[in-house]
């Protein structure tokens, strides 16, 4: 064994040790650390422990631990998992509404004081402490820089990710590239100028790659774009390959889609250190963390044993590699709740059909949390380290407002639904005879017609002629806007389709309610100018915005009420929309309203978002998943939807008789 090999092995051991160190973490726990509870029935607390039985109405003492609770009964002390505990016991009423913050992992500085100390000294020499003035910002900066390959910065919105990205780019050795959405490039340049940083370059062309600065900025759109139309595969990312040591991806959750052009461009850079900065890193499902972890931490490693296309690393491989699972298969077995899936989906987690419950398997929930602990540095707005310096309002998510149908709208919806129903039954029968599963892509494409019939009926082809009057949902939205304005608030309405927003705007104009329609139909520069003039520095009473243009980098604390005209299939879209208003400058309590047409697709989408949000919170923020509710799958919803058509027809006939 040569000296060179020994040193290489030592370096690998140090890398594994430092990459495997969990980031410092505080989490919010419901209840209190220790409390009294009463048994609902006589039952076994733990099948693996002798004597772990409790009598009905027996009072016990419960102490919270990582895997659930330690329960002190008359017969001794026994371990009890979270779901079993709440199925057997009723906590004291005083405990239900209580909560506390708990340190799950200590700051890395406690284990590596010299290394973190050196990084803090370097940051001070660079003057970074002059603009990262809050303790948690410097602490997190040094913890992120401590990781030799990279990490995910999961700071929630408005905690200072832009300045953190600049600071990290300066602190790390070598040239750094900050990649962001095109509409945010000018804001990042303004921030650099404000901080007095001159050694930076905005990369727009091949020529710019020849003379790079310490900090370099490029948009995702330019990075993936071909230099010359004649060579479509020769992108700007390929010219930057190996010229950049560190890459920082703002709103890098888009890497969850490994097949997108943006993701391919980022992987192409070949940077030594890779960072993702995103307040909602998983756009939809907790499983999307696998692709993000592979990008920042590598694959098939001791600290990140999963892989996207390779194997799964475990200790038993020292003895035998027989029956070694792939990284995807093992990740799916542990964390993904599937009832069935095609091989295409199992191989990629992105393409192909499946029936999935948005939930991390309860048996592996603690394992998932331990896996992400060294990969993501998480901060939320309400935790003590943040609230020492700044406070954020907690948005109130109101129960959905169920809206009754207007007769003509209901007739249109039923016609569209029947067309979908006939196609669906025929498609299901045909695929069954062929021994194939249903085509999810085709179903979603057809179902889009039902979405439009419910939310944008004037655009439905074949039936839209003459149906230009306001729907009951649009009337409910306008009434809600007026109600909020009467309270002295400035609401923002989110919708998927700009047609809806223009219809609402026309009606508000008749009422002399000033409003701004903010959609992708205008250029970035034009709509930003309107936003500044009429909302930020103006007095327009209402903002009508499409989901697509308000996802990130938009601060709207001057608005203070949220109305979602329709739901989104992506939890990130709704979360980002709501949190545009949640800023330190927000002076009002923010309420969020959701409009649902009774029995329509709105109800399924609302359920889907709820489950996705709870699953992501359970994995990242130690939230609690509930087993008390059953998830209504897409096909079950479809059949319930189809079976409701005769009832809808009866309602139409009854309404017609009343009208006569």
Question: What does each of the following model-derived ranges do?
Answer:
Residues 164, 173-196, 287, 496-498:
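Conserved Walker A/P-loop ATP-binding site and its immediately adjacent core
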Residues 218-246, 254-265, 545-548:
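Conserved RecA-like ASCE ATPase "motif II neighborhood" in helicase/translocase motors
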Residues 1-151, 214-223, 233-234, 242-245, ...:
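Charged, low-complexity
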Residues 256, 514-608, 612:
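Conserved RecA-like P-loop NTPase helicase motor core
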Residues 217-218, 222, 237, 256, ...:
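Inter-lobe coupling linker of SF2 helicases/translocases
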Residues 569-575, 582-659:
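A conserved SF2-helicase RecA2
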Residues 148-168:
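Walker A/P-loop
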Residues 130, 164-174, 386-417, 429-543, ...:
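Conserved Helicase C-terminal RecA-like lobe
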